[in-house]
Amino acid sequence: MKIRKSILAGTLAIVLASPLVTNLDKNEAQASTSLPTSNEYQNEKLANELKSLLDELNVNELATGSLNTYYKRTIKISGLKAMYALKSKDFKKMSEAKYQLQKIYNEIDEALKSKY
C-alpha cells in the first residue's frame, strides 16, 4: 500500500514538473485595452458637448453687453469652471459645468427676448 502511494506521488510530481503543465498559466487571456470602456465613452461624449458649449461662450458673452452685470459675471465664472473641468477630466465637474453653462445660456436668451 505504501509503495503504491509513493509511486503515485512520484508520478504526480513528474507530471506537474513537465513543461506542458508549467506553461498553462502563461497562456491566460488578456483583455483588450484598445477599445474604450463605457465610462471613457461617456466622459468623451460629455467633454465634446462641453467643448461645443464653450465654443458658444464668446457669442453669449458679447450678447450680455446690454444686459445686467449679473449675466456678465455669471457667464465668465461658468466659462472658467467649464475650462477647469475639461482639464481635470472629472465626470462630476464636467456635468456640473455643462449644466451651469446651459442654464446661463437659457437665462441670457430669456433676458434678451424680454428686453427686445
UniProtKB/Swiss-Prot annotation:
Keywords: Secreted, Signal, Virulence. Its main location: secreted. Induction: Up-regulated by agr and sae loci. Down-regulated by sigma B factor. It is found in: Secreted. Belongs to the SCIN family. Involved in countering the first line of host defense mechanisms. Efficiently inhibits opsonization, phagocytosis and killing of S.aureus by human neutrophils. Acts by binding and stabilizing human C3 convertases (C4b2a and C3bBb), leading to their inactivation. The convertases are no longer able to cleave complement C3, therefore preventing further C3b deposition on the bacterial surface and phagocytosis of the bacterium. Also prevents C5a-induced neutrophil responses. This is Staphylococcal complement inhibitor. The gene is scn.
